[in-house]
Amino acid sequence: MLYYAFEILYWCGIREGELLALTPADFDFKRKTLRINKSYQRLQGKDVITTPKTKKSNRVIQMPDFLCDEIQDYFKQLYGLEPDSRIFPLSKYALKRGMAFGCKVSGVKVIRIHDLRHSHVSLLINMGYSAVAIGNRVGHESVEITYRYAHLFPTVQKEMADKLNVERSN
């Protein structure tokens, strides 16, 4: 279960609460999309499904083919899954524990669950996508929020200068 949760978090860049609120009805496997329209929170000891963090958090995300296949396989493993059942009936603490365990076993530094979202945005920046396109995908309210991730690529400035040198010599 945690494997699939972490796959969605990384490859779609969604928030932890958005992940924990997902139901089968949020997936369109023909179109390979994932609809984000709610969020999970624990308030006063009770599980609560709320509206997303911001207006732009309501969105449809295109999933990569391999992730779409993985999630279809995951659904086949879930017994008695209803269209409105949470597909990850976990707490945020359970995700955090799973991440800590996975990091320890693999010998890497422990990261926060939210760092998977940062990594997704960073990957898309590195792939050359615009801040606007990335912001729309991850539900950022403004492009300025997406620009906060620019510091994650310190070599970009050097690469730019190198490419400008090549351009000038042509």
Each PLM stretch: what is its role?
Residues 31, 39-42, 64-109:
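Active-site/catalytic core of tyrosine-dependent DNA strand-transfer enzymes
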Residues 1-16, 20-22, 30, 66, ...:
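Basic, Lys/Arg- and aromatic-enriched nucleic-acid-binding interface segment
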Residues 8-9, 123-124, 137:
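Short alpha-helical segment immediately N-terminal to, or the first helix within
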